């Protein structure tokens, strides 16, 4: 997964370096992330995390309304979560991450100074920090990455729709679904060869994102 993230970052840099017509943006917005836990045949919500993202984007116009969007964004999420059968994942959770989207899009004029767009593709996520505090007590705070309860990496597939106003402001709303199981060996255990066991546990994370960007 680290190699895949490196490839995504390298691809983003190549796109930035080879574009004949491109537009830089800075943006921020709101994130609502839901956590779906599957244990055996049962499936439940672990709870929602809310927060924000901020960063810069790079939009490459390929002509005829088609383009590619990439960038680098920091995200912060926090909320109260609970998995009754997994006490280590119950409490106040806080996460910091970097996000690299690589999405293909299409835009069309819909009025004077106004255009609509849609884009689809993956966002590569690298977690910087993930901690949980049972009962909200700082002394009981646990590093979820250090203990391998959760994975740092995810690939979220999703789509965004929105509008660009006067080629200066972009408003968007999107949905991303996390394709990779986020439970680590600290939850599932390890086999003799060091690989993570398959115990029928899985955690997939999806999110709704609403954002505003300033275009340059």
Residue ranges and their predicted role:
Residues 20, 60-64, 108-112, 165-167, ...:
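Outer-membrane beta-barrel strand-turn architecture
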Residues 20-60, 127-129, 135-140, 207, ...:
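Short glycine/proline- and aromatic-enriched beta-strand/turn motifs that initiate or cap beta-hairpins
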Residues 73-81, 145-216:
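Predominantly the C-terminal beta-signal and adjacent terminal strand-loop region
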Residues 22, 46-52, 94-100, 151-157, ...:
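Residues that define the transmembrane beta-barrel architecture of outer-membrane proteins
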Residues 24, 64-68, 114, 167-173:
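Repeated loop/turn-to-beta-strand initiation elements of outer-membrane beta-barrel proteins
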Residues 30-36, 60, 74-78, 96, ...:
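Transmembrane beta-strands of outer-membrane beta-barrel pores
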Residues 25-27, 43-90, 94:
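Glycine- and aromatic-enriched membrane insertion/assembly motifs of diderm outer-membrane
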Residues 38-45, 85-92, 141-147, 193-200:
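Extracellular loop and loop/strand-boundary signature of outer-membrane beta-barrel proteins
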